[in-house]
Amino acid sequence: MKERNYNSRTEKDYNFWRALYYQLFVVFVVMPVSKLMYKIKVEGRENVPTSSRVIYAGNHVSYLDPPMLAYAVHRRVAFMAKKELFESDNKLLKFLVHSLGGFAVNREKPELATFKTVKAVFNTPWSLGIFPQGKIVKEPVIENITKGFILFAKKFKADIVPVGICGFDGYAKKLFEKDMTIKIGKPISYELDEDEIVREWARQICEFTGFENRVEQAQPETVNC
C-alpha cells in the first residue's frame, strides 16, 4: 500500500464537505468540551480580519490548542503540524488533525509540497494556523522562536494574528474545573522586518499570558509550526 503523503493537499481537500465536517466538529465536540470542562473567555474577536488570508499564530501549551484557537477566532483554520506527529503511533490524533484540514511540515527543510498546500489553503475560505514554538511548552516562557512562520507570511502576503492561550494549567477532569482565556491580538503586517515580526509576536503573546519574554533578536532560520 502506498504511504500517504500528509504534507500534500489541494484546494479540493478544503471543499464543502470538509468545511461542514469541520463546523460540526467545532459545534458538537469543541464547544461542549470548552463550555463544560473549561470556563473559557474569549477576548479580542474584533481583531479577527474579515479576509481569510491570515496566519493565526498561538503559543502552544497543550493538544487542545488547535481546536480552542479555531473556536476563538470563529474561522476555519488549517493547522500546520510537525511531520513527527504523523509518524507517531497515535492514530486518533493523526486522524483528527488530518481530517480537520491539517497537514505535515518538515521543520528543518520544508518541502515544495508544503508551499503548494499553503497556497491551496489561501485559495479557499480557510486560514492557516501555526504554533511558532514548534512544540508544546509547559514552562511560562516564550523563547527559541524561529522565522519559519514568517517565510509563509511573506511568500503569500498574509498578516499574522497572535493568539494567546492563557491560564491553562492541566487537562480538566471534571465539569467547570478550569478557567481559560483566549486573547486575540492585533494583526502584524507581513511587510515588517522579520526580526520585528518575531519580537512583536512574542511581545503580544507575553502581554496576554504573563509569560517571560526571552526572545532574542538573532533567530535561527528553520521552519517551525
Feature locations, PLM:
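Non-catalytic C-terminal accessory region of glycerolipid acyltransferases
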Residues: M1-W17, A113-C225
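Glycine-rich, highly charged phosphate/nucleotide-binding loops
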Residues: K41, K109-T114
